[in-house]
Amino acid sequence: MYRKSALELRNSVVSGESSATAIAEYFYNRIETEDSRIGAFLSLCKERAYEKAAIVDAKRERGEPLGKLAGVPIGIKDNIHVTGLRTTCASKMLENYIAPFDATVIKRIEAEDGIILGKLNMDEFAMGSTTQYSAFHPTKNPWDLSCVPGGSSGGSAAAVSARFCPMALGSDTGGSIRQPAAFCGVVGFKPSYGAVSRYGLVAFGSSLDQIGPLTTVVEDVALAMDVFAGKDKNDATTQEFFTGSFQDALSLEVPSLIGVPMGFLEGLRDDIKENFFASLNVLERQGSHIVDIDLDILHHAVSVYYIVASAEAATNLARFDGIRYGYRSLEAHSMEDVYTLSRVQGFGKEVMRRILLGNYVLSAERQSVYYKKGTAIRAKIIQAFQKAYEKCEVIAMPVCSCPAFADGEILDPISLYLQDIYTVAMNLAYLPAIAVPSGFSKEGLPLGLQIIGQQGRDQQVCQVGYSFQEHSGIKNICPEGCNKLFDGEVK
């Protein structure tokens, strides 16, 4: 059963081959047997899941129509609210915070009969690229337990990779879905800004954040987006970008022109570069032509991103003060102590580093030097993409400059920030992007191909990713030994 996609599991429930309850039991058995060595989940909600599964099974018994996600087990990144469950953001600051409402994506999942299994680990407040910045425990890469799974949605990627669930929700502020997807050999999709409601997502960078799915195959991304996408009265940034379904769009022809910023591929390892150009050959064999495009301005994207993201983070995290909710220091003896000690003790070092950076670039003395210049260059990055799309329909890039690296191998914060070089620009420019498995490094670790589209052209991005998946032969890949995680096959 672990090899089945979300769509296949849904169809098995509709046909009566499996029940939603049996599927939930099967995946909980996998989690309880093996997650102690991977650390993907922070908490489980078995009672809620079994209650929902029983409702789905009863609907089927009565002959009622079932939702698009009927019986599909889904993991949720722990910065997305689910009523009655803890939303910790993997931080001591919110260790005991219980969500008082459902995020819009959660409402849409449950309206379509999806089964929520639990909350997934992440870098604290989604700030990090390794999932080692969780306040509770690190997450390991199922392909090599000595390696990081990426971040900040590392728990989501690891859970899907280990087949603890066929689908998980993550959030992507600068690559936090796509990079861990590539590291863990799964599919990760960052929708266009405004395509999916952010209501109920704990904000990191409000002009950058986007909720998206991680899955084993591209078909499940399309399934998820047919549920998640659409305007929401609780999120004024949402738009109705799409008319037809994502699943129908997968069958369309690949675009004739695919842009590649050749000047932005410097510094890639030989095996990464070889894999990338081999991936382009797969697309060329389907009739696409590769054209060189000028995106040299993206060499400034990481700097701009960390100015903008840190400024927005400092503003968004100002609410966590030890007064209204969250951790409050027991050592405080004055109001100033409450503010200071609660934040120093409640936040981890990386979160405090970014708050300090954000307040620095927003300070009266530095705002014009850093923040205003950063936002001006962001506008130029958007213009550069618009000009590039005059020559092509979609853009192809690697997801990362390296495969998953060993835990502790990269400790310098600047070196970690530079891991985002191929992902942050899409958030700055509001663009959709998908990461699909493209092969393996010389160490045998997964690599990913990234396809980027114009804002609102999410369906085309998924279609190219699907076409690559089907013609490359790299589909639904599993870590060695994944089939040994749980021997039973529940019907």
Swiss-Prot record:
SUPFAM superfamilies: Amidase signature (AS) enzymes (SSF75304)
Reactions listed under catalytic activity: L-glutamyl-tRNA(Gln) + L-glutamine + ATP + H2O = L-glutaminyl-tRNA(Gln) + L-glutamate + ADP + phosphate + H(+)
Recorded GO MF terms: ATP binding; glutaminyl-tRNA synthase (glutamine-hydrolyzing) activity
EC number: 6.3.5.7
Name of the top EC class for this enzyme: ligase
Coiled coil: none
One biological process term in Gene Ontology: translation
PROSITE patterns hit by this protein: AMIDASES
One Pfam family per UniProt: Amidase
UniProt-listed Gene3D superfamilies: Amidase signature (AS) domain
GO CC terms: glutamyl-tRNA(Gln) amidotransferase complex
Residue numbers annotated as active site: 77 (charge relay system), 152 (charge relay system), 176 (acyl-ester intermediate)
Keywords attached to this entry: ATP-binding, Ligase, Nucleotide-binding, Protein biosynthesis
Job of this protein: Allows the formation of correctly charged Gln-tRNA(Gln) through the transamidation of misacylated Glu-tRNA(Gln) in organisms which lack glutaminyl-tRNA synthetase. The reaction takes place in the presence of glutamine and ATP through an activated gamma-phospho-Glu-tRNA(Gln).
UniProt xrefs under HAMAP family: GatA
Annotated NCBIfam families: gatA
Family: Belongs to the amidase family. GatA subfamily.
Oligomer and partners: Heterotrimer of A, B and C subunits.
Name of the protein: Glutamyl-tRNA(Gln) amidotransferase subunit A
Species whose genome carries this gene: Chlamydia felis (strain Fe/C-56) (Chlamydophila felis)
